Regions:
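Beta-strand elements within well-structured catalytic alpha/beta cores of enzymes
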Residues: 2-15, 27, 51, 94, ...
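Short, solvent-exposed loop/turn segments at secondary-structure junctions
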Residues: 11-14, 41-42, 57, 108-113, ...
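Short, structured active-site-proximal loop/turn typified by the sulfatase FGly-forming signature C/S-X-P-X-R
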Residues: 15-59, 104
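A short acidic (Asp/Glu
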Residues: 16-19, 115-117, 200-202, 245-249
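Secreted, luminal/periplasmic, and some membrane-associated catalytic domains
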Residues: 19, 37, 42-43, 66-83, ...
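His/Asp/Glu-rich, glycine-adjacent segments
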Residues: 55-203, 215, 276-282, 286-293, ...
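Conserved alpha/beta core surface patches that mediate binding of polyanionic ligands
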Residues: 171-178, 183, 268-271, 405-413
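Short glycine/proline-rich, acidic loop/turn segments that cap or connect secondary-structure elements
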Residues: 412-431
Length: 456
C-alpha cells in the first residue's frame, strides 16, 4: 500500500484560507478540494468515527463526544476506549488487504486499546490528592518515555483550558514526525487542535483569529514538507466549521422548571441526577440528546423543547433516522440549535448552588460539553497572582481548586454541531491526487473511501 498521511486541522474551512495562511493558500491552489457535508452532530468524536469507519453514527454508535450510559445511569464524556466504536476501522480493513500495512494514530480520539500499530493520546495522571498531572498514553508503552524525553511532557494545559496555545499542536506535530522516523507507518492520522480554541472564544470574524491562522499555517508547512519529503501522499481535512453564535440555550433549566429534571443536593450545591430524572439533556455544542425515562412522555417533552427560543429542530423516534441518529445510545429526542445559538449544560437556577466542578476545568464530571472552560473569569480581580498562589500550593502538595472558570455562557462566540448555512463554513478535504477526489462535495462517510483510494 502507498504511504499516506491524513492531517486533521480542526475548524479549518474554505473561508479561513487566505492572506493569514500563505502556505495553505498556495498548497490548496495546487490541490483538489471538496467540501464535506458535516455529520450530525458535527463534533470531534462523531466526525472522526465516521471518517475512519465509513459508517454513520447509527451504525458505529458514536452519537457525540459523550452520551448517557443507561446501564449505570451516568453521563460520560470523552471516553477513550476504541472498543466503544461499533464498526470496523480503516486500519483493520487495510491490514486485511495488505498484511504489511501499519498505522499510527496521533491524537485522533478513541485511541486507547485500539488495533493501530502506534498510538499517542492525551491521558493525564489523576492523583489521589486531587492533582491532575500532564501526561499521555502510548502504544507501545515505551513510546511515551521516548517522546517525552525528546520533546518534554505533553503540554496538557496548552491542549485544553484557559491557557491553550500552539505548544500542544506543535508537540503533536513533533511527535508525529518522530514516530514516522522511527516506524515509517503506511497510514498516519494526525490531529491538530489549535484553531478550535479562539474560534470558540472569539468567533471566526474576530481579527485576532489571524494570529492563530498564521501559527497553524506554519505547523502545516513543516508537517507537509516533512511527509512529502518522505514520499507520502498528504490529505488535509477538517471535522467541522465553527460559526458565529451569540445565544446560549440552557435546555436543562427548561426541563427543571417544568418538573422533568431532578437534582441531588450536596453541601449546599446541586448535582444533576439523571437516573432520577423524567427527562434531561446531554448537550454537545449545537446538538442535544434529550433522554426521556417514560416513552409515553416523549411527545410532551418534544413539544416543550420545540418551543424554546434558539431551538431550530426537534426530532423524536423514527424522525431521528433522517440524521442517522437512531441508536440505543442516542436520546429519545434530538434537538438542533439555530444558526446563532448553542446549548450549554447549566441546570442550576442559582449560581450559588452550582457544583464545585462548574468553576474548574473538569471535562469528565460535567454532564455536557462546556466551552467556557477555555476562558478565565474576567470578573476575578488580580487573576494572575491568584493563579500563581494556587499553583504554588499545588507544587507544595496542598489541595487546591483552580476555580477560575466563569458561569457565563454568553462569553462564547463560536460554536459547531449543526450544518452551517454556508458551504464556505463546511469542513473540507484537500489532496493533490485530483483523480481520487472527482467530486466538489462529499458525504462524511466518503472520507473513508478517499483515504482507502490513496492507500491502494
Amino acid at each position: 500500500m502507498k504511504k499516506t498521511v491524513v492531517i486533521n486541522v480542526v475548524g479549518l474551512t474554505p473561508s479561513l484560507i487566505g492572506e493569514c495562511t500563505p502556505f495553505l493558500k498556495e498548497w490548496s491552489q495546487a490541490a483538489q478540494r471538496a467540501a464535506i457535508h458535516p455529520v450530525l452532530p458535527a463534533v470531534t468524536c462523531s466526525a472522526q468515527a465516521t471518517y475512519f469507519t465509513g459508517k454513520w453514527p447509527d451504525t458505529h454508535g458514536i452519537v457525540g463526544n459523550g452520551w448517557y450510559f443507561r446501564d449505570v445511569c451516568e453521563i460520560k464524556f470523552w471516553h477513550q476506549s476504541n472498543k466503544l466504536v461499533e464498526a470496523p476501522k480503516i486500519w483493520d480493513i487495510a491490514r486485511q488487504q495488505d498484511p504489511t500495512f501499519t498505522c499510527a494514530n496521533m491524537f485522533w480520539w478513541f485511541n486507547m486499546y485500539s488495533t493501530v500499530d502506534f498510538s499517542v493520546t492525551p491521558r493525564p495522571q489523576y492523583l489521589a490528592d486531587g492533582r491532575k498531572m500532564p501526561d499521555c498514553y502510548t502504544h507501545p508503552a515505551g513510546l511515551r518515555d521516548h517522546l517525552q524525553a525528546k520533546f518534554g511532557t505533553f503540554p496538557l494545559f496548552d491542549f485544553w483550558g484557559p491557557r491553550t496555545t500552539i505548544r500542544s499542536t506543535q508537540w503533536i506535530a513533533n511527535a508525529s514526525m518522530e514516530v514516522d522516523r522511527l516506524h515509517n507507518p503506511t497510514l498516519t492520522l494526525i490531529y491538530l487542535p489549535h484553531l478550535d480554541y479562539n474560534l470558540q472564544r472569539l468567533g471566526p470574524k474576530d481579527p485576532k483569529i489571524g494570529t492563530d491562522l498564521g501559527e497553524i499555517d506554519a505547523v502545516c508547512k513543516e508537517l507537509i514538507a516533512f511527509y512529502e519529503g518522505r514520499g507520502a501522499q498528504v490529505i488535509m481535512l477538517s471535522e467541522y466549521g465553527i460559526t458565529d453564535v451569540n445565544q446560549p440555550v440552557a435546555l436543562n433549566r427548561v426541563l427543571r422548571q417544568n418538573g422533568y429534571l431532578s437534582v441531588r443536593e450536596e453541601r449546599g450545591t446541586e448535582l444533576l441526577d439523571p437516573g432520577a430524572s423524567e427527562a434531561f439533556a446531554v448537550v454537545d455544542h449545537q446538538l442535544a440528546h434529550i433522554y426521556v425515562k417514560n416513552l409515553d412522555r416523549v411527545a410532551e417533552v418534544q413539544q416543550l423543547i420545540a418551543g424554546v427560543p434558539g431551538v431550530e429542530k426537534v426530532l423524536a423516534g423514527k424522525e431521528r433516522d433522517a440524521i442517522h441518529l437512531s441508536h440505543p445510545r442516542a436520546g429519545e429526542i434530538i434537538a438542533l440549535a439555530d444558526a446563532r445559538s448553542w446549548f450549554c449544560y447549566y441546570y442550576w437556577l442559582d449560581d450559588e448552588r452550582a457544583p464545585d466542578f462548574a468553576r474548574i476545568v473538569e471535562i469528565h464530571k460535567k454532564p455536557g460539553y462546556d466551552p467556557v472552560e477555555m476562558i478565565a473569569n474576567p470578573r476575578i480581580k488580580f487573576l494572575v497572582p491568584k493563579v500563581a498562589l494556587k499553583v504554588l500550593k499545588k507544587k507544595m502538595g496542598f489541595r487546591m481548586l483552580m476555580d477560575i472558570i466563569p458561569l457565563d455562557a454568553s462569553l462564547i462566540r463560536g460554536s459547531h454541531g449543526r450544518v452551517p448555512e454556508s458551504k464556505e463554513e463546511y469542513p473540507l478535504l484537500m489532496t493533490k491526487n485530483a483523480a481520487l477526489l472527482p467530486q466538489t462535495q462529499i458525504q462524511p462517510t466518503e472520507v473513508f473511501d478517499v483515504i482507502m483510494k490513496h492507500l491502494q
